[in-house]
């Protein structure tokens, strides 16, 4: 695309994998702007958490923004990454410079003022789009991600701004709800607190605000876009979302993964390998067994790389664990999450020493080595908007065993690149696992599936063009509306 046609796009997010992440949102927020920069000038706005401020990347203050209602004044800094990606940092120490995650303290308790913290992010995005940030760069389109950025499209609408916006739902279950009593301190107009606006069963919902006031809603897979219009997956918003779908304002665009996920070159792996170099893949498996204190074995190695939360169906994995062990398999589990889920994983490992190992926490290097060393990845998610782990695993020749839902259904070809099961039951899961035992017993079939999985086209190019087309449509409509 010529420089003349490059448009200015501001991503608004609470996570960026380069600096801070708790899940797939951080990966997407880092990868998609980079994948799109040959088409558009895409920059990112993120809160100034300690992980951002202390990242070692220079930050140059470019502007100051005043307060609004209970939202404090703040500064905006510019950070230039080594590869050229421009990050705008919202600097407000009283809101963001705290130990913990972007959302919770070191004990896992949500910050009581999260509504203030992320409303300030949304307002800053609106101020950016209005040209109130003293910068030569002003976005022509704002792309907000998940509930922490939900008020960005809302403030833009309430302030009468014409800049178009997109809101992407990464996980509808996390909605950012707060009492309606907070409306005054957030500067929310009364007319926005309606069923058509951000009111949700007597509360205010940040995610609903993003969906209600953005020009278009996207989700991270085509199947999930359909699922969230149904009671099973709609989290109480299915009717609202169906009305958006009926108006052509809801679409599903799949995520991708970046090019670093290459078994032949990944710097994290113990041993690089290519398709049909399975003895080299086994060297990674040996490392995983040693890391998780598993016995030496020639049986199948199953990996769990996951947040340890109810959504991920880990209770189902506990229910099938003995069946896996009795069939000669081993399980390596890494992740962190809800305390009761973490305790359940520890208890599972204690029941099967040498056969099941667990490491509470998350380490990117070890996770990559697990994808490379395992034969199968377990993903029995109750729902999965997109999922990235199943794509990482396939790229490294580990075949996913997953529930047939959301992005898992869109990215796994059953019996070709992995194994899908339909019901969230131990019985349905067990049937899929029995197929893995059969495939593992026939190396020529196992290796053929591995080759197909490693060749799957999970790059970001599949997402870039649909987003670019959506950007073009919204910008064209905006020009038409503002010229009338």
UniProtKB/Swiss-Prot annotation:
Belongs to the glycosyltransferase 1 family. Bacterial/plant glycogen synthase subfamily. PANTHER family: GLYCOGEN SYNTHASE, GRANULE-BOUND STARCH SYNTHASE 1, CHLOROPLASTIC/AMYLOPLASTIC. Gene3D superfamilies: Glycogen Phosphorylase B. ADP-alpha-D-glucose binds at residue 21. Synthesizes alpha-1,4-glucan chains using ADP-glucose. This is Glycogen synthase. InterPro entries: Glyco_trans_1, GS/SS, Starch_synth_cat_dom. Keywords: Glycogen biosynthesis, Glycosyltransferase, Transferase. GO terms for biological process: glycogen biosynthetic process. It catalyses: [(1->4)-alpha-D-glucosyl](n) + ADP-alpha-D-glucose = [(1->4)-alpha-D-glucosyl](n+1) + ADP + H(+). Its EC number is 2.4.1.21. The gene is glgA. GO terms for molecular function: alpha-1,4-glucan glucosyltransferase (ADP-glucose donor) activity; alpha-1,4-glucan glucosyltransferase (UDP-glucose donor) activity. Pathway: Glycan biosynthesis; glycogen biosynthesis.
